[in-house]
């Protein structure tokens, strides 16, 4: 029996977003006061992300008889991430040159007030590649979970899962216990997801109330260019990859519409991470691949952030009248490939990453970030949506490469079969 439309989660979230926009626009002070609702929902989700990743990765790896497979899956995932991320960076660069969103501003960098971006610049300075790699190693096992650092949690999970796999039958009871605990945490996710409309309402009301729709007008060309480019990237680049793997990107997007609306409302792709992992398992991807690819992708496969970074850099250069040579643009690409790995699925991280990129490329004034500070929140939604779609496609692709994709289930679910996560426990965890 079909649910009444008003009980469907994505309908509730969409309605909440619309109400949030209206409240923020007509009663901005009240809209700003709704911020705790959005923040509270994201904190509830972040509270559960660590245990979800740990349980999923550990049970997935513990079920592998060949430990070389873990390295193989990780290697394929990183190769995919680098290739697609490079495409995203190039597309952002090309779109900015083609559509020229910054031409005509004629702004003198010396007249820009950098106080507003000081906090982002201070956060952006500091981390070298070595420091980034060292940061992945937590001070203690428990500090990884206390800090909520996804890469640190992933490292702990990899070691724990590998140890259980080596112990084999002697550790079987531990694996079974973690599997049962995993079910408990996923049930908690279902409960938290029920309040997603409230979180989306609060976050959207705050965004519109604080920044106002009027702040969009002067920079509509940049916003339109970014959204248009992201849509083209998803439909053409990710669509081609999906077609080569044997599924439709449009149907895939329809399948994860609830997660996308949650991301749209909160501007954070992390808000949908636990539910997304469930959906991908339900779609036919093996638990081991989901557990490895999705958390890693939140630092290494941020397609939307990559498009945004190169486009924003060229926009600032155009707006301030700076001509970039081919070598300077190649330098920007190289730097962006490194700095983008420091981004995460948290709201505002893309802006911090942009500051890090500009700090390494002295040709373009960091002060130019002031131009897009007011609209960054409105671009954050598109970044997060593109990121989560990209990570979903990556997981299906790597599962297919590993021959651990249940293609019959994939076709059935995307063609309108049961896509609910309630019966996820029935999905096998082994080779598909």
From Swiss-Prot:
Protein task: Responsible for the transport of dicarboxylates such as succinate, fumarate, and malate from the periplasm across the membrane.
Membrane topology note: Multi-pass membrane protein
Main localization (coarse): membrane
Keywords: Cell inner membrane, Cell membrane, Membrane, Symport, Transmembrane, Transmembrane helix, Transport
HAMAP family referenced in this protein's UniProt entry, alphabetically: C4_dicarb_transport
GO MF term (any one): succinate transmembrane transporter activity
Family listed: Belongs to the dicarboxylate/amino acid:cation symporter (DAACS) (TC 2.A.23) family.
Listed InterPro entries: C4_dicarb_transport, Na-dicarboxylate_symporter, Na-dicarboxylate_symporter_CS, Na:dicarbo_symporter_sf
Membrane-spanning segments: 8-28, 44-64, 78-98, 148-168, 188-208, 222-242, 307-327, 355-375
Protein known as: C4-dicarboxylate transport protein
Subcellular location field: Cell inner membrane
Entry GO CC: plasma membrane
GO biological process: L-aspartate transmembrane transport
């Amino acid at each position: 029996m079909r649910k009444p439309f008003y009980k469907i989660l994505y309908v509730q979230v969409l309605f909440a977003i619309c109400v949030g926009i209206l409240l923020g626009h007509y009663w901005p002070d009240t809209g700003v006061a709704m911020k705790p609702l959005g923040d509270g929902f994201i904190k509830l989700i972040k509270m559960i992300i660590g245990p979800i990743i740990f349980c999923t990765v550990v049970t997935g790896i513990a079920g592998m008889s060949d430990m070389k497979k873990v390295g193989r899956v990780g290697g394929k995932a990183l190769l995919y991430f680098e290739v697609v991320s490079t495409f995203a960076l190039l597309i952002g660069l090309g779109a900015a040159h083609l559509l020229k969103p910054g031409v005509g501003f004629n702004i003198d960098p010396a007249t820009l007030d950098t106080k507003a971006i000081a906090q982002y610049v201070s956060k952006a300075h500091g981390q070298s590649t070595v420091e980034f790699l060292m940061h992945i190693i937590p001070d203690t096992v428990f500090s990884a979970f206390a800090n909520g650092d996804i890469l640190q949690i992933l490292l702990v999970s990899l070691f724990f899962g590998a140890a259980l796999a080596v112990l084999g039958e002697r550790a079987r009871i531990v694996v079974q216990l973690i599997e049962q605990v995993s079910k408990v945490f996923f049930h908690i996710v279902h409960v938290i997801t029920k309040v997603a409309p409230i979180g989306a309402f609060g976050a959207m009301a705050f965004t519109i109330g604080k920044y106002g729709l009027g702040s969009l007008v002067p920079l509509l060309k940049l916003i339109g260019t970014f959204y248009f480019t992201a849509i083209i990237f998803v439909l053409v680049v990710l669509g081609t990859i999906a077609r080569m793997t044997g599924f439709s990107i449009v149907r895939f997007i329809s399948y994860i519409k609830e997660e996308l609306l949650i991301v749209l409302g909160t501007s954070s792709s992390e808000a949908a991470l636990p539910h997304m992992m469930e959906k991908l398992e339900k779609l036919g991807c093996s638990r081991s691949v989901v557990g490895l690819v999705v958390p890693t992708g939140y630092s290494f496969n941020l397609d939307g952030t990559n498009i945004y970074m190169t486009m924003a850099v060229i926009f600032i250069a155009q707006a301030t009248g700076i001509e970039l040579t081919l070598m300077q643009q190649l330098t920007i690409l190289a730097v962006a490939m490194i700095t983008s790995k420091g981004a995460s699925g948290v709201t505002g991280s893309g802006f911090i990453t942009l500051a890090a990129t500009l700090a390494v490329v002295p040709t373009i004034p960091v002060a130019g970030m002031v131009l897009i500070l007011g609209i960054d929140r409105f671009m954050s939604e598109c970044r997060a949506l593109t990121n989560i779609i990209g990570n979903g496609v990556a997981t299906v692709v790597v599962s297919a490469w590993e021959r651990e994709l249940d293609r019959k289930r994939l076709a059935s679910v995307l063609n309108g079969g049961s896509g609910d996560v309630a019966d996820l426990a029935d999905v096998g965890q082994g080779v598909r």
